[in-house]
Regions:
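Short, well-ordered, mixed-charge alpha-helical segments that flank or form enzyme active sites
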Residues: 67-68, 118-123, 159, 185-189, ...
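Condensing-enzyme catalytic core mediating Claisen C-C bond formation in acyl metabolism
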Residues: 1-30, 128-209, 214, 251-267, ...
């Protein structure tokens, strides 16, 4: 699910739901983000052929205080909910925990959801929308969007209506979460909320180095490494930090914040950000290529600045 600005970006053709009004029919920006989460979960149920009762747990989060977008957006479905806050890394956190839950045998089907909204994030973290502040080139544009994913122990789903059963192929039989490296808090003392790429890049570098060591990764193993929202500024810092560690990923690396907008045409400075940034790019760019076998192994590194 994406907003109007995201629709005009390079991935605009690939979203399932786009509203012509970034309020999504709501009465406030917070209400709009709740509706985005609800729409994303509804679309997940539609595409998988499931009912809410088929989902054992939901792991979900957003950027707002007390996770109000998540709690109000998902309350009507009556599904056990774990509310998560990992700033803009929430999509990775929810997928990681969902995969652990399924792999450990605690659930068969778990939903992982994350959302953000430009206007609600600006209102809470930065400046009033009518203030008209100047944005430095290192700043990023919070994505209005949400992604909902099913983590399941079965590549196909059996749906029964009375005595009649049918097989629903979710189309992602070849896409699995084969391993997880959990990031640590890495703080270089950056305090500029208009330069989150610089704040997050050291943590991303630390995680990628840890992943290479944990899984004994050699050059050529991954077809793509994609971070969440370092943007153009954070990208260069990340590549520099990794080269200092003896790791060169420049030929396979990109960032969700870079992919979601055209910075020259859309005036988005360093790129996109927010929980919704990695949430919508993961499906429209990464999973689509995995499903088509254009990519075989991807390291997905959503990043968050706990400023």
């Amino acid at each position: 699910v994406a907003g109007t600005k995201e629709k005009k970006g390079p991935l605009g053709c690939c979203f399932d739901v786009v509203s012509q009004d970034d309020l999504f029919g709501g009465e406030s920006w917070e209400d709009a983000e709740s509706r985005i989460q609800s729409l994303a979960f509804e679309k997940l149920l539609e595409k998988t052929g499931m009912m809410p009762d088929d989902i054992r747990y939901i792991y979900a989060g957003d950027l707002l205080g007390q996770l109000i977008a998540t709690s109000f957006g998902l309350k009507t479905y009556d599904v056990p909910l774990f509310g998560l806050y990992g700033a803009c890394s929430t999509m990775g956190e929810s997928l990681s925990l969902a995969a652990m839950c399924v792999n450990a045998g605690f659930a068969d089907n778990v939903a992982a959801i994350a959302s953000s909204h430009f206007a609600s994030a600006e209102k809470q973290f930065r400046f009033p929308l009518l203030y008209g502040n100047q944005r430095p080139m290192s700043s990023t544009w919070t994505v209005t969007g949400a992604g909902a994913y099913l983590v399941s122990n079965s590549p196909v789903i059996t749906k029964c209506d009375g005595d009649v059963c049918r097989i629903v192929d979710n189309g992602y039989a070849n896409v699995i979460i084969s391993g997880i490296t959990t990031g640590k808090i890495v703080d270089y003392g950056v305090k500029d909320s208009m330069n989150m790429g610089a704040c997050m890049a050291p943590a991303a570098a630390d995680l990628i180095e840890a992943n290479y060591k944990d899984f004994e990764v050699t050059k050529g193993y991954y077809d793509m490494i994609i971070t969440g929202d370092l943007g153009y500024t954070g990208k260069e810092i990340l590549l520099t930090l990794l080269k200092e560690k003896g790791i060169d990923i420049s030929d396979i690396y990109t960032d969700c914040g870079i992919e979601v907008f055209d910075k020259n045409e859309q005036d988005t400075q360093s790129g996109g950000s927010g929980c919704g940034c990695s949430a919508i790019v993961l499906d429209t760019l990464v999973l689509d290529k995995l499903r088509k076998r254009e990519l075989k192994r991807v390291l997905f590194v959503p990043t968050g600045a706990l400023l």
